[in-house]
Amino acid sequence: MTNFMDKRYSRRRFIKSAALTAAGLSLGPYINLGKAHASEPMKRVMGRLDFEVTTLGLGGQASLQWTPVDVDPIKIILKAFDSEVNYFDTSNVYGPSQSYYSKAFRQLNLIPGQPGYNERLRRSIFLTSKTALRFGKGGWQKPGLINVSNGTGRHAADDLRRTLSLVFGDGQGSYPKGAYLDMVLMHSISGMPDVDAVYEGYESTDPRAETIGALAALIDFRDGTNLTGLNPGEEKLIRHIGFSGHASPPVMIEMIQRDSRRILEGMLVAINANDRNYFNMQYNVIPVAEANNMGVIAMKVFADGAMYAKAATWTSIPDMVVLGVGSDILPSRRLIEYSLTTPGIHTAIIGIGHIDDDAAACQLKQNLLAAQIKPDALSVSDRRDIEKLALTAKEGKTNYFQNPI
């Protein structure tokens, strides 16, 4: 174990190449490592977040949420660290995902207050969680409003503390001094009721109000203030605030435009090679986020596995998790390149179903190699060619989560 940890703390260099295509790679479903050379993972600056992020981040779903019996999700997280991935994603609606991070973080000495706490390593990564609870206080119901959590709390601060306890604390509500999240996203902003709810009390915060939205509450926990009356200890538990969305570009644009104080610094958005078959993100909300200098994270690169054998529906059981690497007809590399060359995108989070000592069979290694691409590496013609490839997946009808044109 000592040698294992020493390698990890030195941030072991991983085989990568910024010119993989020129290295003469296979056109098959996986990348041949034979001619790749060692270099550090490619990074991009995440807008106003001002963090140099690796172009691949670890998604908090796949085997971290729906864990097959023969998969160890903790090893997936540790392998991502070994591979120098520095963006890590989870959520309060991802089942055991946050608890798996806790087990990995304890091996990595990332728990504040514990002997050997590695603060330098903690500062080198970006940990994001999410809350789909729309209110900081009170609340109301409207058709279409998403307001859910895997926890027992009813409000955004409950989810925030739940994450800190599950990842850094005892899992029962307590968390150590010095624990924090780099960002909290308001999860799956899908309709105008979601926007209206989170913005309650944003312009004029009154602690006497019956209802206060999630955003005003999260601002208090970012700034260490108590304008809402919901943070009496004036704790500073998060560094940045953002939101995620899969469905509606107009709703997501409204989310950004209503933010007169420029609080929102990050956006997690569904973007893949079938995007233009739907009410697309790449020509609508992503340019708005880019114009606001937000950090933009791509998700659903493989349409939650629907680009391959999985049905075009939400994953709900471990048997639905995709364990393979691409296909001969639709190489995963091309889909990753598409998302990462979409203007405005800084990184892509991809959930991992399976890791392997065989590089050709290891989703994490293959995804990381494919992510070594510059933002302008593909021409418009190149991107259209990838879109044609993506049409071979269910005739392009993969993005069940995205609104139609």
Give names to the regions the model predicted.
Residues 46, 260-263, 280-405:
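Structured C-terminal cap/extension of enzyme domains
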Residues 9-28:
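N-terminal export leaders
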Residues 46, 58, 88, 127, ...:
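Conserved, mostly hydrophobic/aromatic
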Residues 146-273, 290, 294-297:
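Glycine/proline-rich, positively charged
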Residues 60-70, 141-155, 319-327:
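Active-site mouth loops of central-metabolism enzymes
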Residues 90-108, 191-193:
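Glycine-rich, proline-tolerant flexible connector loops at the mouths of alpha/beta enzymes
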Residues 29-60, 374, 379:
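C-terminal segment of N-terminal export signals and the immediately downstream linker at the start
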Residues 1-10, 35:
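N-terminal secretory signal peptides
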